[in-house]
């Protein structure tokens, strides 16, 4: 087993457990015949976390060339996976009696879940800071034309979601975040390639 496979076995386990929490929570509602009570905010939050986990899984392959088995390289992905697991574990209630009050359940736990997602984004930014400097130095147009606006949009939506109070605002922000993460990962490299060609690289 090579170094990346050894790392990915542990990393994938944590991410897999996070997916299990999401699917298990949804399956619990199906078993309790409570699917009609599934609130839009909860459904979108679960979908967002699922998309984030899938995107993180895709990103893991970009790390395969230079991964080393030490805390210097592993702290970021392990923290990232841990934050996603904690967020996923809280999305759906474990008590069937709470299915009838999903709106209240969402409101009571929204800041914790979104806080975990913001923490994951902060870890991702910190881990990629050298890459940001490299892009700024060698591809400034791409850096200012895509990387910065894209990340500002994501971070802005997360912060707005953390402080949002209305149901409509929550739904709009969750939908926007899902689209923001789906677009560049739908076909890896397509958006980056378009931006690079736009700026003449």
State the predicted function of each range:
Residues 40-63:
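A generic, lipid-embedded transmembrane alpha helix
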């Amino acid at each position: 087993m090579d170094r990346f496979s050894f790392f990915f076995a542990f990393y994938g386990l944590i991410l897999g457990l996070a997916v299990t929490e999401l699917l298990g929570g949804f399956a619990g509602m199906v078993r309790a015949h409570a699917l009609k009570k599934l609130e839009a905010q909860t459904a979108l939050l679960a979908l967002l976390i699922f998309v984030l986990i899938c995107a993180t899984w895709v990103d893991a392959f970009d790390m395969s060339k230079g991964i080393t088995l030490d805390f210097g390289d592993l702290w970021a992905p392990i923290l990232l996976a841990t934050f996603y697991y904690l967020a996923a574990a809280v999305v759906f209630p474990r008590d069937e009696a709470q299915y009838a009050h999903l709106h209240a359940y969402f409101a009571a736990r929204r800041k914790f879940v979104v806080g975990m997602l913001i923490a994951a984004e902060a870890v991702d930014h910190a881990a990629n800071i050298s890459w940001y400097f490299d892009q700024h130095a060698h591809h400034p147009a791409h850096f200012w034309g895509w990387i910065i606006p894209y990340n500002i949009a994501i971070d802005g939506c997360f912060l707005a979601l953390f402080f949002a109070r209305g149901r409509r605002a929550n739904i709009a922000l969750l939908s926007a975040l899902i689209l923001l993460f789906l677009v560049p990962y739908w076909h890896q490299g397509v958006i980056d390639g378009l931006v690079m060609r736009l700026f003449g690289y």
